C-alpha cells in the first residue's frame, strides 16, 4: 500500500507542476485537489505502514 501511495504522490506532484506552471491552466483546480488528496493518502499510508 505504501508503494501505491508513493506512486500517487509522484503523479500528484507532476499534475501540480503542470497545473501551477501555466501549461495546463484549466487543470489547476483539479491539480490542487489531486495534490491534496494524494498527499493525505501518502501520509496516512506512511503512518499505518509503520505500525502494521
UniProtKB/Swiss-Prot annotation:
Pfam families: DUF1328. Keywords: Cell membrane, Membrane, Transmembrane, Transmembrane helix. Its main location: membrane. The chain crosses the membrane at residues 4-24, 29-49. InterPro entries: DUF1328. It comes from the Bacteria. It is found in: Cell membrane. The keyword Cell division does not apply. It is a multi-pass membrane protein. GO terms for cellular component: plasma membrane. Belongs to the UPF0391 family. This is UPF0391 membrane protein Avin_10980.
Amino acid at each position: 500500500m505504501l508503494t501505491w501511495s508513493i506512486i500517487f504522490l509522484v503523479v500528484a506532484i507532476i499534475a501540480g507542476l503542470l497545473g501551477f506552471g501555466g501549461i495546463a491552466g484549466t487543470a489547476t483546480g483539479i491539480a490542487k485537489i489531486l495534490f491534496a488528496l494524494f498527499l493525505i493518502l501518502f501520509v496516512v499510508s506512511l503512518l499505518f505502514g509503520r505500525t502494521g
